């Protein structure tokens, strides 16, 4: 394998096919085609209502980027109108898309570990915020244990931010603090997320274990807090140093 000076990773989230911003999507497509990143990560909410039509549009778009991509589901990627399917097989439609266009990324200078923070229902309303389950957390921890001796930085990819926007605020992700601490303790150094539709880049800690939290914005029309459509570019060098560039679409 040739040795390169750095790995370039495009981090996008919340495309929300069905209410996508087509101009912003074209802007992102052009960047992918011109710059040829090593890989893409999409941290959830690929669709707006998880309809077959929206998944078909997502499949066509992601396949057309012609770049290795890791897809993570978001709360919008479970059936909204078909409750039977939502409870019986919530990720069947997402799984078909992931099988068609998704990839397990093997990057030269980083390791990406998926972590699912979605549940089809919960004992609160709305059902949109994250829930950490022991089973899914253990799956991510087991993967980190397998990678323990690999010197490359371990990057978690999930949909929901694991911590609230600021310390002291109520955490909308149930057991997110626990997951943050255990993942950091297991060797993860970065967590990529979406969900909130505005970008951020923070160093946060719990119980003396720190991780860098990097959130991507959205490429949809569902804008929040005055933030324009955006995505992130991560450049990871041979030493594991990660530079993050936030790119905003000019409205």
Kindly label every feature range from the protein language model.
Residues 168-239:
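Conserved beta-sheet core of the metallophosphoesterase superfamily
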Residues 2-10, 104-114, 149-153, 205-212:
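Beta-strand-turn-beta hairpins that frame and shape the catalytic cleft
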Residues 18-20, 48-53, 75-83, 119-126, ...:
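Active-site environment of divalent metal-dependent phosphoester hydrolases
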Residues 236-251:
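A short C-terminal boundary segment appended to hydrolase-like catalytic domains
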Residues 1-64, 81, 100:
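N-terminal active-site segment of His-dependent metallophosphoesterases
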Residues 144-165:
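Short acidic, glycine-rich surface-loop motifs adjacent to enzyme active sites
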Residues 56-139, 182-184, 207-209, 233:
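Extended active-site neighborhood of metal-dependent phosphoesterases/phosphodiesterases
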Residues 11-13, 40-45, 69-75, 116, ...:
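Active-site neighborhood of phospho(di)ester-bond hydrolases with catalytic His/Asp-centered motifs
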């Amino acid at each position: 394998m040739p040795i390169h000076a750095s790995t370039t990773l495009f981090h996008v989230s919340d495309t929300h096919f069905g209410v996508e911003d087509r101009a912003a999507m074209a802007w992102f497509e052009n960047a992918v085609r011109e710059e040829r990143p090593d890989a893409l990560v999409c941290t959830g909410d690929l669709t707006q209502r998880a309809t077959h039509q929206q998944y078909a549009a997502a499949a066509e778009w992601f396949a057309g980027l012609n770049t290795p991509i890791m897809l993570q589901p978001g709360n919008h990627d479970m059936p909204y109108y078909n409750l039977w399917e939502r409870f019986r097989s919530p990720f069947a439609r997402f799984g078909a898309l992931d099988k068609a266009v998704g990839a397990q990324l093997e990057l030269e200078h980083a390791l990406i570990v998926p972590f699912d923070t979605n549940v089809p229902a919960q004992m609160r309303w709305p059902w949109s915020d994250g829930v950490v389950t022991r089973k899914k957390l253990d799956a991510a921890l087991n993967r980190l244990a397998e990678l323990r001796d690999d010197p490359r930085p371990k990057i978690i990819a999930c949909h929901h931010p694991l911590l609230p926007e600021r310390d002291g605020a109520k955490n909308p992700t149930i057991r997110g603090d626990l997951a943050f601490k255990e993942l950091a303790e297991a060797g993860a150094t970065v967590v990529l997320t979406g969900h909130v539709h505005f970008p951020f880049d923070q160093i946060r800690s719990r119980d003396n274990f720190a991780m860098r939290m990097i959130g991507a914005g959205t490429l949809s029309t569902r804008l929040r807090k005055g933030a324009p459509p955006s995505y992130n570019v991560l450049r990871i060098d041979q030493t594991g140093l990660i530079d993050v560039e936030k790119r905003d679409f000019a409205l």
